[in-house]
Design a protein with these regions (language model features):
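Catalytic cores of nucleotide-sugar-dependent glycosyltransferases that transfer UDP/GDP/TDP-activated
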Residues: 9-242
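Short, Lys/Arg-enriched N-terminal segments with co-localized hydrophobic residues
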Residues: 1-8
Length: 242
């Protein structure tokens, strides 16, 4: 029989949280499974809850100019949201900006990995400041846990369909303005994704439905896609006799 060559990889998962929320737990399960398979997997997160050495809380540089940079960016994002959410109807899911207070600073923490896997990264990874440069350095996989990567801010479009052309006049903002916050976010994402070589970013979805959404979207349509259902630890979840 032929010997099987197993190559271990050094992998970084980027996630807004490690275990708080369903998307974070899915990311953490993948990270844990990869480690059990012999890979050198790490998580870099905006909020750490688990007591695990391979999960790293991101704090960012603490210099005076860096703190001012984050404060200024945080204030601008909050001001734009405050102005744009005045007429927002009740009952919708989260709506998040493509920017984060960290901006480009996050790139300083991402070195010497074979591959980077993004997960639910809202309010943590600044897409325009991070993704184009990151994808030029290292292969990137983005595992989508909802629709946010392809929209102007919503995490589920509730049948709106604007993500297939261009966001604006957003129902989830209660907006009738074409150049509203959803259009601004959509256009910034379009510039960021436009600066990325299609071969440097792979989109992974846990369902065929979400994969079809990505394929039909203006923002993600050019990138290769794979459907990989969520994994479970079969030591915990396995058929048993009743």
């Amino acid at each position: 029989s032929k010997a099987v060559l197993f190559l271990t990889m050094k992998i970084l998962h980027l996630s807004s949280s490690d275990i708080a929320g369903g998307a974070a737990r899915a990311a953490h399960r993948l990270h844990s499974g990869l480690r059990l398979s012999g890979h050198d997997s790490h998580m870099l997160v905006g909020k750490k809850s688990a007591d695990e050495v391979e999960v790293h809380q991101y704090y960012g540089p603490r210099g005076l100019s860096d703190r001012f940079y984050r404060k200024r960016r945080r204030g601008k994002i909050a001001k734009d949201w405050q102005k744009s959410s005045v007429n927002r109807p009740a009952g919708f899911d989260r709506f998040t900006d493509d920017r984060s207070a960290h901006g480009r600073l996050l790139l300083e923490e991402i070195n010497d990995y074979d591959i980077v896997n993004l997960h639910w990264v809202s309010e943590f990874v600044d897409l325009g400041e991070v993704l184009p440069e990151l994808t030029s350095r290292v292969p990137v996989v983005w595992t989508l846990h909802d629709m946010n990567a392809m929209t102007g801010g919503c995490h589920y479009d509730a049948g709106c369909g604007r993500y297939q052309s261009q966001c604006g006049s957003c129902p989830q903002l209660g907006s009738t303005e074409a150049a509203d916050l959803s259009r601004q976010i959509f256009d910034r994402k379009a510039r960021a994704f436009g600066d990325i070589d299609a071969n440097n970013l792979t989109i992974v979805t846990p369902s065929e439905w979400l994969g079809t959404c990505a394929e039909s979207s203006t923002l993600l349509g050019k990138f290769p896609r794979q459907v990989i259902p969520y994994g479970l630890n079969l030591d915990d979840f396995t058929p048993r006799d009743r």
